[in-house]
A protein has these predicted regions:
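Membrane-interfacial segments at transmembrane helix termini in multi-pass membrane proteins
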Residues: 264-306, 401-405, 409
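Short loop segments and helix-boundary regions at transmembrane helix junctions
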Residues: 33-122, 221-235, 248-260
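Hydrophobic alpha-helical transmembrane segments
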Residues: 18-23, 71-76, 98-102, 145-150, ...
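Hydrophobic alpha-helical segments embedded in the membrane of multi-pass proteins
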Residues: 26, 30, 49-50, 105, ...
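Transmembrane helix-bundle core of multi-pass membrane transporters
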Residues: 3, 104-159
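Helix-loop-helix "hairpin" substructures at the membrane interface of multi-pass membrane proteins
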Residues: 141-212
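Structured cytosolic domains appended to multi-pass membrane proteins
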Residues: 309-418
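Membrane-interfacial amphipathic/re-entrant helices at transmembrane-helix boundaries
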Residues: 1-25
């Protein structure tokens, strides 16, 4: 690893921390995606907390504080906790969240008691055990990084080999069981992957903050992709970026690495939820505002064009006919004016020629949507739940939209509307 120290213009400790964070980010990102999709993300939190008593018992039994011994203890305790959670979740009268809570609280309590007893024993070699609570990345050595990359490789290979089974169980457990797939094996494999991710992250972010690395990259990736394989890849990439950037930022600021990584991961997930295209809160709010504006404009066009499109109408009268407030109507009229569809003069509104053509198109689109509702089942169409009836061609294609329009024109029930 000396060549890497020479290649990067960073202190050796910073390089080690960044590499450890890289392995953690990739492992937690990929494994956490499966946990989030399976609604088992808190199982990872419980396993992380359950690793503490294993570390404490390993130290008490061996009397040594070397990483290998403590890692073995963490693996055993985490595996026992995972098996216990799976067993309790199959108990008919015990909810899944209750099983997780029992294991998490019980194991963490035992871990805190043992760590407190070890600290009060006065043994000189017990210093640093409490770092497994919040992580102490500055204390990792090359052997820790090597172990992290080995565990990362094992986790990635397992995910690749078991992708088909994991995908089926993740999205439809009942169907998978009916199809004869090894559902319990898949659940055990998912729990084992969580154990691996937790062991990789204990030294970096600690037992308490480990859940952030399992959830945040997966939540962020979920906002951008809809398929499992791209989500696993993107989540691993996001986790790697979060881990490395957190390690470098904490080194530059001289603050603990674990909390910084957790903060960056949380910020990344929040920003993705807010700003992601098509799914983000901001994009959805903007889309709904535009949809409401289009709907208001369409309602006004149809109302103004219903009787005498060329005759001026007073906004107050239009509001009364529509059952809307005058303020609502005037806001819509402003939109029509800006689009060149209406003219307001002396507090009277008149549709322009373009406005009358637009009203006619809107009326035909609404009639076609009505035809979809009434006759769509004959054409093998899905339920008419299209949020924008003015853009049926975008959902059904030009040919099918034109066919619905013809059916609407030929339907005598719509003659009065036309």
């Amino acid at each position: 690893m000396n060549w890497l120290y020479d290649l990067l213009p960073l202190p050796g400790t910073t390089v080690l921390v960044a590499l450890g964070a890289l392995a953690l980010g990739i492992t937690a990102g990929v494994v956490g995606s499966l946990a989030v999709l399976q609604q088992r993300s808190l199982v990872g939190d419980a396993i992380a907390h359950a690793a503490l008593p294993g570390i404490a018992v390993a130290f008490i039994v061996s009397g040594a504080r070397d990483s290998a011994t403590l890692t073995i203890g963490a693996v055993i305790a985490a595996a026992v906790a995972a098996a216990l959670i799976l067993r309790l979740q199959r108990t008919p009268r015990l909810r899944a969240d209750a099983a997780i809570g029992v294991v998490l609280a019980g194991a963490f309590s035992v871990g805190v008691v043992l760590l407190t007893w070890i600290t009060g024993s006065g043994r000189g070699d017990q210093a640093g055990l409490e770092s497994y609570l919040f992580g102490q990345a500055s204390g990792i050595v090359e052997s820790d990084v090597t172990l992290s990359f080995i565990l990362m490789a094992i986790a990635l290979i397992a995910v690749i080999v078991l992708t088909r089974i994991l995908r089926a169980v993740t999205f439809d457990r009942t169907f998978s069981a009916a199809a004869g797939l090894p559902v319990r094996f898949a659940e055990a494999a998912s729990a084992a992957l969580l154990v691996i991710a937790v062991v990789v992250g204990l030294r970096m972010v600690g037992a308490i903050l480990m859940v952030v690395m399992l959830i945040a990259p997966a939540v962020a990736a979920r906002q951008f992709v809809t398929r499992l394989s791209p989500m696993l890849a993107l989540s691993g990439l996001i986790g790697a970026v979060v881990g490395v950037s957190g390690a470098l930022a904490s080194s530059a600021a001289g603050v603990p690495t674990g909390p910084v990584i957790a903060l960056i991961g949380t910020a990344t997930a929040v920003l993705a939820v807010l700003l992601a295209p098509h799914r983000g809160v901001a994009w959805t709010a903007r889309h709904r505002m535009r949809a409401r504006s289009r709907l208001r404009r369409t309602e006004l066009l149809l109302a103004l064009d219903h009787a005498q499109p060329a005759a001026p109408r007073v906004p107050d009268a239009v509001a009364g006919d529509m059952g809307r407030s005058v303020r609502w109507v005037r806001r819509g009229l402003g939109s029509l004016q800006r689009a060149g569809l209406a003219v307001v003069a002396n507090d009277a509104v008149t549709l322009t020629e373009a406005g009358r053509r637009e009203a006619q198109r809107a009326r035909e689109a609404v009639l076609a949507w009505s035809a979809w509702i009434e006759h769509g089942w004959r054409l093998g169409l899905p339920d008419a739940r299209e949020p924008d009836p003015l853009n049926l061609a975008g959902s059904l294609g030009d040919e099918m939209a034109a066919r619905l329009a013809r059916m609407a024109r030929e339907d005598p029930a719509h003659a009065a509307v036309r």
